[in-house]
Amino acid sequence: MQSSTYAVKGNAAFAFQRRTFSSDRSTTSTGIRFAGYKSLATTGPLYCSGSEAMGATLARADNGIQSVMSFSSVKARSVRAQASSDGDEEEAIPLRSEGKSSGTVLPFVGVACLGAILFGYHLGVVNGALEYLAKDLGIAENTVLQGWIVSSLLAGATVGSFTGGALADKFGRTRTFQLDAIPLAIGAFLCATAQSVQTMIVGRLLAGIGIGISSAIVPLYISEISPTEIRGALGSVNQLFICIGILAALIAGLPLAANPLWWRTMFGVAVIPSVLLAIGMAFSPESPRWLVQQGKVSEAEKAIKTLYGKERVVELVRDLSASGQGSSEPEAGWFDLFSSRYWKVVSVGAALFLFQQLAGINAVVYYSTSVFRSAGIQSDVAASALVGASNVFGTAVASSLMDKMGRKSLLLTSFGGMALSMLLLSLSFTWKALAAYSGTLAVVGTVLYVLSFSLGAGPVPALLLPEIFASRIRAKAVALSLGMHWISNFVIGLYFLSVVTKFGISSVYLGFAGVCVLAVLYIAGNVVETKGRSLEEIELALTSGA
């Protein structure tokens, strides 16, 4: 998932670029769009052209898979799950069976990803519309109120990310999606019809609550209904649809130059996928894991039949119950996340998102326009295309390797590449011996950084979190980790430009390189590999190692 640095930073980047790089208003306006567009790299690449690669990944994910829409199960076999710390081992039976499955998962993953589309769309829609809505609402000269319109989405998302876990545990995953559609639709409607700044901010706040809930439950639901063999590939689809939402927002802004009031339509159109999400989830199966955990075994059997086929009902219900999903242990409370039993794994989830935000994606986003111009690339569109292509390629590669190379390996490779890229960027600005090549080196460093980020640091955390958390704490722990993401995102947005002004961009880049190195060391020592394991196997491994 990605994560999102757009909201506060788009506005801050605009102010900085207007002050530093351009005095021409039209150029500044382009700078807003470009900076916002690239900051979406933190949510993942513009992955639209990667759909063919995704299809190939799904088709190759396991030799037993006969087609993308009909999953074959591989032979059941014992897998020795190694614990993450003490080296203890547990024998577990994966949720697999022999024979061809008559169920299908993809349509329901697609419905869930409407939430991801809305996530990306609401992040990106204000980027092109801000200048026009500011004029329409009479705040063209008031950058403070413009900042509130932008950043209120982040505030709402922080609330939503914490709320999503509790709702998912209490009402179930599908019902929470339906509840989530309410603030998403109302927020979009208020923004589209706003006649005052106050109404606009309330609309953005509600939309933020909606995308905050989506950021928690979309990866959670997908991970819980996906077959073990292709869970990594399906989990990375979340990134794809976030980027489709971002791209849709970018395209939706094209008529603005000819029709300044088009910004209202841009916000209003988001009501449609919100309604479709609510309707689609009314026909989608609930997570079998949640149902068994609630003691609703008969409903779980129906969900398993829909998702995996009637051939697997008995086997999967038995395995889910045996793994502890059906135990009478009460649902975990928020304070349980900080207990000695769970804190280690919860801290891993929070740390991954903190490293993601502190590793410098914001700096690369902010300065990419000036970096490309220093290399003679004057077109913002060309620069965006280059950064976008790097994102597309990186995530396409990551999705194809997710179930082969593994999540942990991708994270290590990603943060290692980001560290080297940051070092190259820092040297390109300060090392006089490289002055003649500084522009070219800066572009190379930027592209390599974005490519490295999209290989692991961008897409893996949102996929990994639902996998490493025990079923009893999964929803709340995912929500807590994503809440840390939104909070750190907001804080970085407030102080980043001040730090750059005081220390200089080269020193800041060097600091980011150090953070990436720390991330590599932390991941190597604390993150457990989840490739090829069922969620039950992972839970056994982490519990035995606690």
UniProtKB/Swiss-Prot annotation:
The chain crosses the membrane at residues 105-125, 148-168, 182-202, 205-225, 240-260, 265-285, 345-365, 381-401, 410-430, 441-461, 477-497, 503-523. It is a multi-pass membrane protein. InterPro entries: MFS_dom, MFS_sugar_transport-like, MFS_Sugar_Transporters, MFS_trans_sf, Sugar/inositol_transpt, Sugar_transporter_CS. The keyword Plastid applies. One of its GO terms (molecular function) is transmembrane transporter activity. The keyword Plastid applies. Its main location: plastid. PANTHER family: PLASTIDIC GLUCOSE TRANSPORTER 4. May be involved in the efflux of glucose towards the cytosol. This is Plastidic glucose transporter 4.
